[in-house]
Regions:
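Structural marker of alpha-solenoid helical repeat scaffolds
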Residues: 41, 74-76, 109-110, 143
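Canonical positions in the second alpha-helix
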Residues: 38, 71-72, 105-106, 139-140
Length: 164
């Protein structure tokens, strides 16, 4: 489509899927192109703007990310993806306590609980608090008993706490 300079119409959900595809591939330049094209068609879409925030974070454009967080803050506090982006923003800037606050808000929405507990636990590891990290890795395992990441980190926390 880009190479042939063709224009196609996609609804918001289709653009979101395209952007997620490129984000998961780690192809942030194509994700950014998809976001920009999507915003030219759907300039007021909060979902697309949240994906733009994800792209800014991956590209480490923290000034633009903060501007977008400020713009979306009031209208997106009930959106798990937005709250995770805020948590990632503060985590990347070395503020794990603020990151945990946003993850706690997202947990109240009862979506992606396994991911959020792992995220919170990782932040507690960054704070050198293996006890609280262990609690959240264990909670993540309660939501997904087959999560190898959580299980490995539970063992790591027990080791850090010198528990058999």
């Amino acid at each position: 489509m880009i190479e042939n300079n063709e224009e196609f119409y996609f609804d918001t959900e289709e653009y979101i899927e395209i952007i997620i595809y490129y984000l998961e591939l780690g192809d942030y330049s194509y994700a950014e192109m998809a976001v920009n094209h999507a915003l030219s068609i759907h300039p007021n879409s909060l979902e697309i703007k949240t994906k733009q925030l994800e792209v800014f974070l991956e590209l480490e454009r923290y000034v633009k990310a903060k501007e977008l967080i400020d713009e979306l803050h009031q209208s997106s506090l009930e959106d798990t993806d937005f709250l995770v982006c805020c948590a990632k923003y503060y985590s990347n800037l070395g503020n794990p306590k603020k990151s945990i606050e946003y993850c706690q808000r997202a947990l109240q929405l009862e979506e992606e609980e396994n991911f959020l507990h792992n995220f919170i636990a990782d932040e507690y590891v960054n704070l050198d608090d293996p006890f609280n990290a262990l609690k959240h890795y264990t909670s993540a395992l309660e939501h997904d008993p087959f999560d190898d990441y959580s299980l490995e980190n539970v063992m790591l926390c027990y080791n850090l706490l010198n528990r058999p």
